[in-house]
Amino acid sequence: MASFPPSLVFTVRRKEPTLVLPSKPTPRELKQLSDIDDQEGLRFQVPVIMFYKRKLSMEGEDPVKVIREALAEALAFYYPFAGRLIEGPNRKLMVDCTSEGVLFIEADADIELNQLIGDTIDPGTYLDELLHDVPGSEGILGCPLLLIQVTRFRCGGWAFAIRLNHTMSDTLGLVQFLTTIAEFTRGAEGAPSVPPVWQREFLAARQPPFIPFHHHEYEQVIDTTPDDNKKSMTHKSFFFGPKEIRAIRSHLPLHHRSTSSTFDVLTACLWRCRTCALVLDPKKTVRISCAASGRGKHDLHVPRGYYGNVSAFPATVLRAGMISTSPLEYAMEGVKKAKAKMTGEYLRSVADLMVTKGRPLYTVVGNYIVSDMTRVGLDTIDFGWGKPVYGGPARAFPLISFYGRFKDNKGEDGIVVLICLPEAAMETFQEELKKMIGEHVDGPFDYNPIKVVSKL
């Protein structure tokens, strides 16, 4: 079992936040979001983070200055990001392209990168220091659509953290924007290699609406969850390398061990452990919702350069008791069934549902949403310092776990999973995970959190 760094105390000094504006004048206009974008379940802020090592060829270059200038250039093309969201009739979201800019924070931390990243990574532990929540910036309406903090470490390494208003883009759309920034940091001139495309009407509801699918992920369920499961939430991350995945596969019948994807195997394991940890009524129905992109689907021709949301969260419904007591294969079949639902037609059905049912929130009770970010490209963004040592999700949410790619100190590639659970449930979750994996699992057991002292 890998260990985290010992308890550390470090200070982060931040300058006052500033607004970065597009580098040249941009159109003043209103742009409607799609009926996928403005659904209730995407009206939140999602953070991601990248860490970069010192690079000798970049000595003398300040990542803060480099990023700030390239960001302004990129915003000239992605100018809606510099605007603010407003609501129209029936709460329809649209961007008021005001060119007010995005929030940018310059910071320095008296710590070295290798003290934060070792055999595994737990970005949620220190995210509040590397991505300061500027008071008044966290809203959906009338607030900056992006918040960026660049933090220099004393070793010459640095961190790039960004918070995205999820209604504007999915992760692939964000990566497209970050790639444009990266191109400008490396000296590109003119337009981005992939010009941005708005065209949010592409995923507007059809007339008349047509909903041929049963969308379990949006069913409203009465909450009977014990109060203990609604408070004292804690965040932890877990690393799953080849040994851990093999250990999980060993719980499956032979015919499933070689035919099931890593995502299927890992997600089934996490869903089972989480269900056990929450100590739910065995008769209670629970859901697994797998975030799935419509990009690349044969029946959905997404325009190249489109950076809006193109994802759905198809779900499978099973009994909690069956998941907890049945072999792992049972939960995995539920995961596969949820994934198989995703098509272009399914996504259009979601858009129609949003308009017909008044943008219902995804199911909160008994739902577990999993978003695999290992292949979106966050780990390839090169601002001139090479690829990040980690580029991926920064924090989980109570109902949502994210997967990110990570290579440990031994050079072993694996998956970091970010988990958010009530404190008592987290302890049980770890014990359940040990049963599935034994002592292979790299997690936060016996971990003393890093302590931080923040200063403006």
Swiss-Prot record:
- Keyword Magnesium present in the record's keywords: the answer is no
Tell me which Gene Ontology terms the entry assigns under biological process: alcohol metabolic process; fruit ripening, climacteric; response to ethylene
Top enzyme class, one word, equals transferase
Q: Which GO terms describe its molecular function?
A: acyltransferase activity
| InterPro entries with a match to the protein in the record | CAT-like_dom_sf (IPR023213), Plant_acyltransferase (IPR050898)
Q: What is its EC number?
A: 2.3.1.-
Active site feature: 166, 382
* Residues spanning the membrane: none
Keywords, alphabetical: Acyltransferase, Transferase
Q: Name one Pfam family in it.
A: Transferase
Q: Which PANTHER family match?
A: ACYL TRANSFERASE 4, OS05G0315700 PROTEIN
General function of this protein:
Involved in the biosynthesis of volatile esters which confer kiwifruit flavor. Alcohol acyl transferase that can use a wide range of alcohols as substrate to produce esters.
Family in the record: Belongs to the plant acyltransferase family.
Descriptive protein name:
Alcohol acyltransferase 1
